[in-house]
């Protein structure tokens, strides 16, 4: 085997054995330059909760769709079926486009594709659909990806419809920026019980060095409440409430910290 061919073969083997290396390869294809995964992206790519779920609370523009698309490609390589839900059709098309881009960095071939569905020669399928109880029934999946979970309409109805589609041992990946406290995604973080088969990841914009300039720009342009929600990933009381619930909770707390002001 010529040296160049051997080098290519070894590089491809490394990516197959190391999902993070594969993810970085996909990013480089998309960005047109070398890319390195953030620590949280490594955690999300490697997260393995058979029969359970991983919930990712992530700031805007941090790269969560890249992680979800990579999880989709990894499942295609195994010949599995992935269902990806998003609040709107535009978002389903965008993540399908990203999966198609990443597939060009693999040895798989596409047998059939539409704007929201891809089938490969491994027998795997990636299907992206707008999240409504009516459109998602009837599928069976090995993996479920829910993008912008906090923004789903009728979220409890949608989740109730989709969870029975998972095969035994199938995994769910919820990803979103927070959008208030009164939704399914918020309850995953606020009401989690220790016995739940659920892994929680929180990624604030202030924790990502490559986003430092953008974070400072948003700090000056967004209201304090919006910055806390969009960048710091806090679950803020819904806009209908005149007072932020966290302020009310602190004011009514009987702890010394709440009663005695600090100067």
Describe the residue ranges of each PLM region.
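Walker A/P-loop
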Residues: 50-71
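Conserved Walker A/P-loop ATP-binding site and its immediately adjacent core
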Residues: 79-101
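Pre-P-loop entry segment of helicase/translocase ATPase cores
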Residues: 1-53, 261-262
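ATPase catalytic-site recognition across NTP-hydrolyzing enzymes
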Residues: 205-263
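Inter-Walker segment of RecA-like/P-loop motor cores
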Residues: 93-142
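ASCE P-loop NTPase helicase motor core
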Residues: 97, 101-103, 143, 151-222
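Hydrophobic residues on the short alpha-helix immediately C-terminal to a glycine-rich phosphate/catalytic loop
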Residues: 48, 67, 71-75, 95, ...
């Amino acid at each position: 085997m010529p040296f160049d061919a051997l080098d290519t073969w070894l590089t491809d083997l490394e990516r197959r054995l190391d999902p993070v290396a594969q993810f970085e390869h996909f990013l480089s294809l998309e960005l047109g330059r070398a890319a390195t995964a953030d620590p949280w992206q490594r955690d999300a790519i490697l997260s393995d909760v058979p029969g359970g779920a991983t919930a990712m609370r992530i700031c805007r523009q941090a790269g969560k769709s890249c992680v979800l698309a990579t999880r989709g490609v990894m499942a295609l390589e195994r010949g599995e079926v992935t269902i990806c839900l998003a609040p709107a059709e535009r978002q389903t098309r965008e993540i399908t486009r990203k999966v198609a881009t990443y597939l060009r960095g693999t040895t798989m071939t596409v047998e059939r594709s539409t704007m929201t569905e891809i089938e490969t020669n491994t027998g795997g399928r990636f299907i992206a659909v707008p999240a409504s109880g009516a459109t998602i029934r009837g599928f069976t999946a090995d993996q479920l990806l829910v993008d912008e979970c906090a923004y789903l309409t009728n979220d409890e109805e949608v989740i109730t419809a989709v969870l029975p589609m998972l095969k035994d041992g199938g995994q769910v990946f919820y990803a979103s920026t927070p959008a208030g406290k009164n939704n399914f995604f918020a309850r995953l973080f606020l009401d989690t019980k220790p016995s739940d088969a659920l892994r929680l990841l929180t990624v604030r914009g202030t924790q990502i060095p490559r986003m430092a300039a953008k974070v400072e720009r948003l700090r000056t342009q967004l209201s304090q409440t919006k910055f806390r929600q969009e960048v710091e990933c806090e679950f803020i009381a819904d806009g209908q409430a005149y007072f932020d619930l966290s302020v009310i909770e602190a004011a009514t707390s009987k702890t010394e910290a709440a009663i005695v002001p600090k100067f």
